[in-house]
C-alpha cells in the first residue's frame, strides 16, 4: 500500500463528474523519482462533502459523513485508515478500516469518495494499493519554484479547466 494525500478536488457542475486527485507521499526513496497521482471521478455532491471536510466547514447540521463519524466516536471505535483497495475499470473500491474497542481491525466496504470524506474528518491516513497506482496512476511532477507570480498564473489557468478539457 502507498500512502497518499488529497492533492486537489476539481469541482464540476451539472452532469459532468468531479475529480479527486490523490498524490503519492514523498519518501526518502522517491527524492529523485516523480511521484504518482491517481484521479478518481465522483459526483458533485460527493466532491462538495469531501471539500467541506477538508475545509472544516460546519454546515450547521451534520451531513451524512459528519453523522457517521459522530456515531463511530459515540460507539467507542475509531477510523484507523482508508484504503483504495481494488478497481474494476473504471470503478474504484475502498475500505474504511475501523478499529474496535479490543484493537481488532474491521474492513468496511465504501465508495472511495465516502471513505475519503471520513478520512479527512478524523485525520486518518489514506492508502492506495500499489497495483492500482501502477495501472491507473499518472506521474505527478513537483517543481521547486518559488516564483509566486508564476504559481498564481498557473493556479488561475487550472481553475479555468473542466473535465471536458481532458
Please give the residue ranges for each predicted region.
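Divalent-cation
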Residues: 1-166
